[in-house]
């Protein structure tokens, strides 16, 4: 039968895998800061459950998800394997109601607090587009680059079709011209 899950539910599940099994209530606001810089309210994370998994199996799952990105045989290696951000994830390709046009999924999380920022979990779905490794995984990488570096670091092959003609400036460098497809 059909599996009905939202990207938020998948991201929450990824966060729990990454943090050792704790499920938190999703929240959008950490604190409220006034114009003078004073904090008028803070919102602590709320634990609402735990994943029903043994620690050794959770560790095996985490290791497998790192290999999806870092192992040359991993499904996301060729799209995001050289990314410097420590991350783990899973590609997915889901059937759609349009024959030959599956939904592309990628979900994952970061670890080791890269660049001094807190870890995050992200779920990406690109409907009716293709394989998760081809379309959703590069978007996952883009989200991480925007979060940790403030801008994307590479231009993907499919972006030239959107009218993007220059590679984003990596770490303050000079952008380069993108070849025509």
Feature annotation, model-predicted:
Residues 109, 160-161:
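Short, isolated positions within intrinsically disordered regulatory regions of eukaryotic proteins
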Residues 1-49, 65-152:
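Active-site beta-strand/loop architecture of penicillin-binding DD-peptidases
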Residues 154-159:
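Short alpha-helical interdomain "coupling" segment at the junction between an upstream regulatory sensor module
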Residues 161-181:
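Ser/Thr-rich, Proline-interspersed low-complexity disordered segments
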